[in-house]
């Protein structure tokens, strides 16, 4: 969010190609205004839950083009706002301006990054709500919390969640509906727990 203006200026004004198209596309999508009116029920529920996690909202000032985080009557520059808040705010913005629909595909690298465990769990709940509406998610994670929460959601909703795990030069596929996969992240988490219990 803090590079939003620079990304757009480099491509649209300066005509340089310093940023990958995915960043340019995201910056363009984020500058679209929120739309009023009825939205998919799942999207409205997800937005409500997203705002609960960050206890506020992110908005852009139309005149300055700068992003800020609003929490109650307080306003903070986006540069001093936590990275986890920014990540969640991006998803909220894309839902509010209707850039996302039930056929969208979202890639999130390390969704756990800069979020405390309770927020990670809530974020996974939101991803499940959106996935049930039709949005397809691809997540890359090194977090036991993420894997375990997705496993629990898969069991609770009887929903297939395919998982690919790298083991050396090989890839192993599993489905969380069938159980937790064996991989180094899970093995190390269990090992630490067992070490503490002993």
Regions found by a protein language model. Give the residues of each.
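Walker B motif beta-strand of ABC-family P-loop ATPases
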Residues: 105-107
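Surface-exposed loop-to-helix/strand elements on domain peripheries
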Residues: 113-114, 124
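Phosphate-coordinating catalytic segments in nucleotide- and nucleic-acid-processing enzymes
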Residues: 1-103, 159, 169-198
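C-terminal lobe/lid and adjacent interdomain/linker elements of RecA-like ASCE P-loop ATPase modules
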Residues: 122-198
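Short, contiguous clusters of charged residues that form electrostatic/catalytic patches at enzyme active sites
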Residues: 86-89, 121, 125
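Walker B catalytic acidic pair
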Residues: 109-111
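Short N-terminal micro-motifs specific to bacterial/archaeal maturation
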Residues: 72, 79, 114, 137-138
